[in-house]
Amino acid sequence: MAFIGVARPDVTTQNGNLATSHIDARVYDINGPLGSWGVWFDYATTKGGQMTAGSVPGSSDVTNIPSTSGYAYGIRHQRLEWHGGYHTFLIQYGTGAASNFSGPGIGTTIPTPSLDTARSRQFLATEQIVLQPTDKFAVMPIVLFQRMRNFNTQNQWQQWISFGVRPQVFLTKHLSLTGDCGFDHTNLPGAYDGWLRKCTFAPQIGPDRKFFGRPVLRAFVTYANWSRTFRGLVGGVPFQNQTSGFTYGLQVEHWW
């Protein structure tokens, strides 16, 4: 169990910096059917107040932001040391001040405040698998489904579906061929409805025959295309008037 406080110095009221307080409780490594289980629960409160002109990014009005609260919870199922890898399935749901959770727990940032923060909602489900049946091949598929409603989505339900796969073939102890292909579809009523597809090929040098062996040095080539709805929204300035793109380069990846 933990108490976590987060504040935004760029947003102020007569009460000081806008702050959110969380009480977070978690229980992991529960042995059960088909593997290990975990659960978490978070309760969050944000004290509102009168925002002075310009204190809220993107707003020029004096706004009285109401105090809000909310809860979030999650359920995780894992199977470790499974076919040379692991399996993790996670479902999370949050409301109001606790709706901006990320990863396996609570959010550590405060979103732009609005009069409708109490109506914010988020549902997120992810399935992540790593398989390495031999020392010559490994593969990692992932699936994600999210529905979200908040200030950034104009209080409409935004839906995001994403899935992809990354195989890796080990040619020697230090040389391997890897890559990935993925697909995303995003829908926000009245704003956009579109998709993006991407594939990457990358020969790389690493320390061993393990999928997560690091550090690695890789050369990569990537091709992506996306629907016309996303023209100007994907790829930044170099691809702002296009619906496809190609890029390449060198990349070093290291963890600690």
For the regions a language model picked out, list residue spans one by one:
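Outer membrane beta-barrel
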Residues: M1-F41, L196-T200, V221-W226
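Detector for outer-membrane/organellar transmembrane beta-barrel domains
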Residues: Y28-L188, W195-F201, I205
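Short proline/glycine-enriched turn/loop segments at secondary-structure junctions
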Residues: D135-F137, A191, R209-K210, P238-T243
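Tryptophan-centered motif/residue detector
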Residues: W157, L171, W226, W255-W256
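Conserved active-site loop/cleft motifs that coordinate metal ions or position small ligands
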Residues: T178-D180, G213-T222
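Outer-membrane beta-barrel "beta-signal"
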Residues: F201, F212-G213, Q240-W256
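Outer-membrane beta-barrel biogenesis signature
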Residues: P207-R218, T229
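Low-complexity, intrinsically disordered Gly/Pro/Thr-rich segments
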Residues: F230-F239
